[in-house]
């Protein structure tokens, strides 16, 4: 709660709006039970939820997530994927995710792209992208084959 309050005081000048936004993100990310716990004592998944809550305080139009699934257990990854999907469905926010874990990423996006040497190699829906030979070669190497 202290983190949310401190950041909101910087980015949201209006006290009433600040309080509304804090209450919204606390509710949205189910942080009620964690209000009295210092951030350094939170689990990895709880910290990810807090970071997303902090990012959404200012109601951004674009949210950039750099390797959000790194160092998380399977259950926490699933929870984070659900949060990302819900955010996409409930708001007009554009979420850009950069991650090396294709399986985790493709489970929660509408469109994905593979970059190689700063160039887009393939861009498509997740279901089409996994079938794309150029994407497979760029991601796995030329010697990778799916039978």
Predicted region positions:
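Conserved catalytic motifs of ABC-family nucleotide-binding domains
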Residues: 59
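Hydrophobic anchor residue at the start of the ABC signature
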Residues: 52
